[in-house]
């Protein structure tokens, strides 16, 4: 587009009809005898900004109930009912707090504790999808204090801003999930006198943005420099969910309960194991600083997945692994089915890997890849996958464990 200054051939703004000297500049539309003046351009930009901000406002009447949130999570995550209920209530409370700023409500940041593959990340992601708010994921192990090699803590804000397509108002009501938070535990309970740039130092840096601050972030991420344009993002209404496996946490909690239950009326260990709940003091003992623990008022514990749950994960949720493979085979005109024995064996092997639901795909991947590589096969219409085919997938084709069209 071409910018014109002055009265050139009596050109007028096609929007307001004014011409020089009433306006300073005209911008000509390419290939057309149409113009817009600098003042109409400014006015259009402001209208776009206002409409965008209006679209970013949170409307309480659109907030789902806790039961609706749990029902939605049930479609994606198998089991973990207590965790889903706690998350649903916490999320509703958080966004009600945004809708009623005049009421003094504590920010409901959440700590998810559970073994690898139990659904921590998927729960957080599904919440954001249902609420239609921007969502960003960060790995705590990649974060360092400002000035050290690695990702600045504020880069997690940049990722959220990018997910919001640089709509600051939308980003300021988004959700950030920080995984592997247990990996930045400090080495001892005492205050460190030496630099721990990826442990206690990161906790201190995260503390500021989690409790609420106006962060000055470079829109494209990376390190700040003096000549760089920065974007202001207020984090006080961003919901932070952090998660980790916290291995050996049970031993810390058990040691506490054993000490307190010595003598008359002491609980039995078997009962204690079922009811074990982690307290803030356990998290501090593990290596989280007290101030950081204090900014995570809701601690949600996810349970390890048994084989029954893993079988359900294979087949039931939206995007279940079995459904995905059935779709891929369907594209080749093949109806793929799995026997109950096959599903049980996959779940059994995944359980042995101790990687939860993540292990399911790993168990099936090679067998499915080998079979898909052979397709298409003329006349092949059905495949019935059994437990033995996990290790010998091509036996399906070689031994007639398939059906061809007549």
Curated annotation (Swiss-Prot):
One of its GO terms (cellular component) is HslUV protease complex. Pfam families: AAA_2, ClpB_D2-small, zf-C4_ClpX. The keyword Nucleotide-binding applies. Zn(2+) binds at residues 13, 16, 37, 40. ATP binds at residues 115-122. GO terms for molecular function: ATP binding; ATP hydrolysis activity; ATP-dependent protein folding chaperone; protein dimerization activity; unfolded protein binding; zinc ion binding. Keywords: ATP-binding, Chaperone, Metal-binding, Nucleotide-binding, Zinc. SMART domains: AAA, ClpB_D2-small, zf-C4_ClpX. GO terms for biological process: cell division; proteolysis involved in protein catabolic process. Residues 1-56 form the ClpX-type ZB domain. The keyword Metal-binding applies. Component of the ClpX-ClpP complex. Forms a hexameric ring that, in the presence of ATP, binds to fourteen ClpP subunits assembled into a disk-like structure with a central cavity, resembling the structure of eukaryotic proteasomes. Belongs to the ClpX chaperone family. NCBIfam families: clpX, PRK05342.1. This is ATP-dependent Clp protease ATP-binding subunit ClpX. The gene is clpX.
């Amino acid at each position: 587009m071409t910018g014109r200054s002055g009265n050139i051939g009596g050109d007028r703004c096609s929007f307001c009809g004014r011409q020089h000297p009433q306006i300073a500049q005209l911008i000509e539309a390419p290939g057309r005898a149409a113009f817009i003046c600098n003042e109409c351009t400014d006015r259009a930009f402001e209208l776009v900004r206002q409409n965008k901000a209006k679209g970013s406002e949170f409307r309480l009447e659109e907030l789902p109930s806790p039961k609706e949130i749990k029902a939605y999570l049930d479609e994606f995550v198998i089991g973990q009912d207590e965790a889903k209920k706690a998350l649903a209530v916490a999320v509703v409370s958080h966004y009600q707090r945004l809708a009623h700023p005049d009421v003094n409500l504590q920010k409901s940041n959440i700590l998810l504790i559970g073994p690898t593959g139990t659904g921590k990340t998927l729960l957080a992601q599904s919440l954001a999808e249902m609420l239609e708010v921007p969502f960003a994921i960060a790995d705590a192990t990649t974060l360092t204090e400002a000035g050290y090699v690695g990702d600045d803590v504020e880069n997690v804000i940049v990722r959220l801003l990018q997910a919001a397509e640089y709509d600051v108002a939308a980003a300021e009501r988004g959700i950030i999930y920080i995984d592997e938070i247990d990996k930045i535990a400090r080495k001892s309970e005492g205050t460190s006198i030496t630099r721990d740039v990826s442990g206690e130092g990161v906790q201190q840096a995260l503390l500021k943005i989690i409790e609420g601050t106006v962060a000055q972030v470079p829109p494209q991420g990376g390190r700040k420099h003096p000549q760089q344009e920065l974007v202001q993002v207020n984090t006080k209404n961003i919901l932070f969910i952090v998660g980790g496996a916290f291995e050996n946490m049970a031993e810390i909690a058990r040691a506490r309960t054993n000490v307190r239950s010595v003598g008359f009326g002491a609980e039995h260990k078997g009962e204690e194991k079922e009811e074990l709940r982690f307290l803030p003091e356990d998290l501090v003992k593990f290596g989280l600083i007290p101030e950081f623990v204090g900014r995570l008022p809701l601690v949600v514990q996810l349970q390890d997945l048994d084989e029954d749950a893993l079988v359900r994960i294979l087949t039931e949720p939206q995007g279940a692994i079995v459904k995905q493979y059935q779709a891929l085979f369907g594209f080749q005109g093949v109806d793929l089915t799995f026997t109950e024995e096959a599903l049980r064996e996959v779940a059994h092997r995944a359980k042995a890997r101790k990687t939860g639901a993540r292990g399911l795909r790993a168990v099936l991947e090679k067998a499915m890849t080998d079979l898909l590589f052979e397709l298409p096969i003329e006349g092949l219409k059905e495949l019935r996958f059994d437990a033995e085919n996990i290790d010998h997938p091509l036996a399906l084709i070689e031994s007639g464990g398939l059906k061809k069209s007549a």
